[in-house]
Amino acid sequence: MARTVHCQHLNKSADGLDFQLYPGELGKRIFDNIGKEAWGLWQKKQTMLINEKKLNMMNVDDRKFLEEQMTNFLFEGKDVEIEGYVPPAEDE
């Protein structure tokens, strides 16, 4: 049976993650309060950030930056801003 959580990002009841995907206290907070749909949205934003800003996940500062962006996106309702990105038109 699927685990249900109240997703803080989407502000609704949603299917919970199957297991903790991120380490530490933040990982526990994500597991307890973020649904699969919101996590999928974050993964897309994360990929764009890594690619557009040429982040190196071996670099501590880049990992800290990405973690801050993740917290802002998932828990504080702040969208990720990616310079130069123009979303596709709705009619395409």
Swiss-Prot record:
GO terms for biological process: cellular response to oxidative stress. GO terms for cellular component: cytosol. Keywords: Iron. GO terms for molecular function: iron ion binding. The keyword Iron applies. SUPFAM superfamilies: YggX-like. Belongs to the Fe(2+)-trafficking protein family. Could be a mediator in iron transactions between iron acquisition and iron-requiring processes, such as synthesis and/or repair of Fe-S clusters in biosynthetic enzymes. PANTHER family: FE(2+)-TRAFFICKING PROTEIN-RELATED. This is Probable Fe(2+)-trafficking protein. It comes from Shewanella frigidimarina (strain NCIMB 400).
